[in-house]
């Protein structure tokens, strides 16, 4: 069974049972991704800052929290000179490189970093 189908079924059951579902905070993924990529606390802190700043601007709406966190980790790794490739980050986060690229572009534009 595909992960997408499980998620869809979970949302359906939760809706039918009128369960309150809180949106997942992308910052919950930062420590795990950073640990698996052997990145520093500085990178984690910068990634959380990127998430906070860009989410305040409404960029998170409708986006996958895992992809969003992964892109923030990628951006933070570059900014802190602990470079990881999009492929490395995508593999750890189980998202595509295209997702990393798209969210990264949105985040750096929103942060005013070009």
Swiss-Prot record:
InterPro entries: Cyclin-like_dom, Cyclin-like_sf, TFIIB, TFIIB_CS, TFIIB_cyclin. SMART domains: CYCLIN. Coiled coil: none annotated. GO terms for molecular function: TBP-class protein binding. Sequence repeats lie at residues 1-17, 28-109. GO terms for cellular component: transcription preinitiation complex. The keyword Repeat applies. Keywords: Repeat, Transcription, Transcription regulation. PANTHER family: TRANSCRIPTION INITIATION FACTOR IIB (PTHR11618:SF13), TRANSCRIPTION INITIATION FACTOR IIB-RELATED (PTHR11618). Belongs to the TFIIB family. This is Transcription initiation factor IIB. It comes from Haloarcula vallismortis (Halobacterium vallismortis). The gene is tfb.
